[in-house]
Structures are given as structure tokens and as C-alpha cells.
């Protein structure tokens, strides 16, 4: 093989390596409004993690053991979920595969949304809504009790750039990224998308229950 051919093969090999996904890129999530996270989750709780360990969780198709991280938690309040308290939370062992890291020791409280596994267990990923409790606004905390649930039939559409539009009356346009370059902006912190009596949806601000006039069509 000539030098030119060897150089070409080397260049092609390097190009292939450069285009392969890196482990850190393996977990990719689309931003969601807190209300969407609430509505999409099976379980939403306020809790502390008290201990952690790695456990086997069955085998893959090749017979190799599947490892997961198990957090033993102390549930403080359940906003959505089964009648039984959640005792254990499971997640993947690495952030590269969307695993979540929680502080243990029982001091830091979290709002945790995820998928139910039954028997007091749930599973979480980096794509779920998991944030320290003390970072939530007072409106977000109060909306967990009832407000977000009122809008689960509505659709929140994120606007990544101007122009953007809604395609149906049951949508609310989420503008935080355009107006504040953040997914944790004003609409995320202080607004919920609520269905009105005619089936349309609109942003509602505040911690107080929506007025009947708002539900019966009133500009927010």
C-alpha cells in the first residue's frame, strides 16, 4: 500500500472517530415547563435521600447484570402518585445514560418527578423534573397542589426563536427562552397553563385559585 493510500485511510479513521457520539452526549433531553413535567410524571414528591447503593436489576439480552443506583428516601409529601409512600428511587449509574445524582444524608430536600415502579419504588432520569425544593418559587410550590393538574389537558409549546405560533386553542406558548434565554424564566416560575370553560387554554399567573371569570373567558 502506498503512502498516499495509508494517509487517506488514517484521515478517514480520524474523521470517523470525530463523528462518534461521546458518552457525555448520550443523554439528551428536551426542555419542559414545570407543569408539563408534573403532568407527564406518574409520581411527584417532595423528599430527602438518606442513603445510596448500587444494586443489580436483572440482566440484559446478553446475560450481563444491569446495574442501577438505589436511593433510600424519606418522603415528605406526595403531590401525585400511588397511595403507598415512595421508599426507594432508582436511576442509571452514570449521567451519560441519564442517571441522577442526589445528595444523601437527609439534609437536602428535592422536588422529584418520575415513573412509578410499584411497591413503593420509582425510577428517575436526568430528563425528569428534579430540583432542590428551596429553588422553587412560592407559586410553583403552591401550583403542585392543584394548579398544574388543572392544565394537564392543555399543551405547552416552547418557542425557541421568533416567530412562533400556537396551532390550536388548547396551547399556551412558552416564551422564556426567547425573552430571558432561560428555561427557568418568568413563565416557568409564576405561570400555569389552565383550561377554560370553552376548551381553550391560557396562561394564569399567581398562587390564588383562578377566578370563575377567568375560567369563563377573561384575558389573563
UniProtKB/Swiss-Prot annotation:
Domain NTR residues, every copy: 27-152
Database matches in SMART domains: NTR (SM00206)
Positions that bind Zn(2+): 27
Signal sequence, renumbered to the chain: 1-26
InterPro entries: Netrin_domain, TIMP, TIMP-like_OB-fold, TIMP_C, TIMP_CS
Chief place of localization: secreted
Alphabetical UniProt keywords: Disulfide bond, Metal-binding, Metalloenzyme inhibitor, Metalloprotease inhibitor, Protease inhibitor, Secreted, Signal, Zinc
Gene Ontology molecular function: metalloendopeptidase inhibitor activity; zinc ion binding
Superkingdom of this protein's organism: Eukaryota
Post-translational modification: The activity of TIMP2 is dependent on the presence of disulfide bonds.
Compartments in which it is found: Secreted
Family to which the UniProt record says this protein belongs: Belongs to the protease inhibitor I35 (TIMP) family.
Function description: Complexes with metalloproteinases (such as collagenases) and irreversibly inactivates them by binding to their catalytic zinc cofactor.
Designated name of the protein: Metalloproteinase inhibitor 2
Gene of this entry: TIMP2
Amino acid at each position: 500500500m502506498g503512502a498516499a493510500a495509508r494517509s487517506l485511510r488514517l484521515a478517514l479513521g480520524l474523521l470517523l472517530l470525530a463523528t462518534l457520539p461521546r458518552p457525555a452526549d448520550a443523554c439528551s433531553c428536551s426542555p419542559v415547563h414545570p407543569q408539563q413535567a408534573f403532568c407527564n410524571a406518574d409520581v411527584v414528591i417532595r423528599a430527602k435521600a438518606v442513603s445510596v447503593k448500587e444494586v443489580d436489576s436483572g440482566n440484559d439480552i446478553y446475560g450481563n447484570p444491569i446495574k442501577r443506583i438505589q436511593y433510600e428516601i424519606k418522603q415528605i409529601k406526595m403531590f401525585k402518585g400511588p397511595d403507598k409512600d415512595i421508599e426507594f428511587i432508582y436511576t442509571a449509574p452514570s449521567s451519560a445514560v441519564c442517571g441522577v445524582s442526589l445528595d444523601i444524608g437527609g439534609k437536602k430536600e428535592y422536588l422529584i418527578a418520575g415513573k412509578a415502579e410499584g411497591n413503593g419504588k420509582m425510577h428517575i432520569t436526568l430528563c425528569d423534573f428534579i430540583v432542590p425544593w428551596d429553588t422553587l418559587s412560592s407559586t410553583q410550590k403552591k401550583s403542585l397542589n392543584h394548579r398544574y393538574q388543572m392544565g394537564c389537558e392543555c399543551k405547552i409549546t416552547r418557542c425557541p426563536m421568533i416567530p412562533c405560533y400556537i396551532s390550536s386553542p388548547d396551547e399556551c406558548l412558552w416564551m422564556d427562552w426567547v425573552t430571558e434565554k432561560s428555561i427557568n424564566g418568568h413563565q416557568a416560575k409564576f405561570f400555569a397553563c389552565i383550561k377554560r370553560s370553552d376548551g381553550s387554554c391560557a396562561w394564569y399567573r399567581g398562587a390564588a385559585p383562578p377566578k370563575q371569570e377567568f375560567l369563563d373567558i377573561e384575558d389573563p
